[in-house]
From Swiss-Prot:
Snake venom phospholipase A2 (PLA2) that inhibits neuromuscular transmission by blocking acetylcholine release from the nerve termini. PLA2 catalyzes the calcium-dependent hydrolysis of the 2-acyl groups in 3-sn-phosphoglycerides. Keywords: Calcium, Disulfide bond, Hydrolase, Lipid degradation, Lipid metabolism, Metal-binding, Neurotoxin, Presynaptic neurotoxin, Secreted, Signal, Toxin. Heterodimer; disulfide-linked. The A chains have phospholipase A2 activity and the B chains show homology with the basic protease inhibitors. Residues 20-27 form a propeptide. The lineage of its organism: Eukaryota, Metazoa, Chordata, Craniata, Vertebrata. It is an enzyme of class 3 (hydrolase). Its EC number is 3.1.1.4. This is Basic phospholipase A2 beta-bungarotoxin A1 chain. Disulfide bonds join 54-146, 56-72, 71-127, 78-120, 88-113, 106-118. Expressed by the venom gland. It is found in: Secreted. CDD domains: PLA2c. The active site is at residues 75, 121. SUPFAM superfamilies: Phospholipase A2, PLA2 (SSF48619).
Length: 147
């Protein structure tokens, strides 16, 4: 390919990205996924923590069925408070953090949306790492057990 073609192709790609309004930082959910991977046992994947219990995954209702499900319940409420009280957008808020010595450090000024959301994710990820994963609580019948 000729250098001029590469230049035109690059310009088209840059303008398409700008038109699509794609944020320059990864979405918060990617950060949360990485935190979870860091704290859970090696034999588990972060995906096994979706559709677990009554609250791990989209939505949630009823009483959490175990300690791990309570982690998700608390996380959902933390995101809810971030939205209602602080006017943040937790699922898309980018933030800075560091994974070190089996813990997670959130950066940024206290009270900012970035720090609030990071603290929500940090608390949940550490809770996941400290909670037992019960295979029978994956993909439960939420209509039956989560009312």
């Amino acid at each position: 390919m000729y250098p001029a073609h590469l230049l035109i192709l690059s310009a088209v790609c840059v303008s398409l990205l700008g038109a699509a309004n794609i944020p320059p930082h990864p979405l918060n959910l990617i950060n949360f996924m990485n935190m979870i991977r860091y704290t859970i046992p090696c034999e588990k994947t972060w995906g096994e923590y979706t559709n677990y219990g009554c609250y791990c995954g989209a939505g949630g209702s009823g009483t959490p069925i175990d300690a791990l499900d309570r982690c998700c319940y608390v996380h959902d409420n933390c995101y809810g408070d971030a939205e209602k009280i602080h006017k943040c957008s937790p699922k898309t808020q980018s933030y800075s953090y560091k994974l070190t010595r089996r813990t997670i450090i959130c950066y940024g000024a206290a009270g900012t949306c970035a720090r609030i959301v990071c603290d929500c994710d940090r608390t949940a990820a550490l809770c996941f790492g400290d909670s037992e994963y019960i295979e029978g609580h994956k993909r439960i019948d939420t209509k039956r057990y989560c009312q």
